[in-house]
């Protein structure tokens, strides 16, 4: 719960309250919009966010009567360009991820991929991860 998170972090507020992979049917009621707005008014969250794969995100974009979320995080790859769902719906690429795993499957140089990603999502945040220390050092140089 948010209260436990705030307590554990010894904070009064989090910047982004992110829901990961929720089902649209569970969040499509007005109560969620009211709940999130109240958290903002109480100063407990600054922004609300939604992290989904592109297929599930479409339900939220097409069916939501109110703007439930300020920030959208969606998987993306250079070959499939899943995040184009945002662009087609006049929404910015804010937080994208999944590039390196898709590049690894295809045997593509990850540094070259990262340079292209920075062009694709030049105003948002790009999440990359690796448990290889050398890759992390290289990624930090791009």
Residue ranges and their predicted role:
Residues 6-27:
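Active-site groove signature of glycoside hydrolases
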Residues 1-8, 84-89:
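Short amphipathic alpha-helices and their capping/turn segments at secondary-structure boundaries
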Residues 20-142:
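Beta/alpha (TIM)-barrel catalytic core signal, keyed to glycine-rich beta->alpha loops juxtaposed to Asp/Glu
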């Amino acid at each position: 719960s948010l209260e436990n998170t705030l307590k554990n972090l010894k904070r009064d507020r989090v910047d982004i309250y992110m829901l990961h992979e929720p089902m649209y049917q569970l969040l499509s009621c007005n109560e969620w919009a009211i709940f999130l707005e109240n958290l903002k008014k109480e100063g407990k969250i600054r922004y609300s966010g939604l992290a989904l794969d592109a297929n599930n995100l479409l339900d939220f974009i097409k069916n939501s009567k109110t703007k439930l979320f300020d920030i959208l995080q969606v998987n993306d790859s250079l070959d499939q360009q899943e995040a184009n769902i945002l662009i087609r719906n006049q929404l910015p690429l804010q937080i994208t991820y999944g590039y390196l795993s898709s590049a690894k499957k295809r045997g593509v140089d990850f540094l070259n991929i990262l340079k292209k990603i920075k062009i694709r999502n030049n105003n948002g945040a790009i999440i990359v991860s690796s448990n290889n220390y050398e890759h992390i050092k290289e990624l930090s140089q791009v």
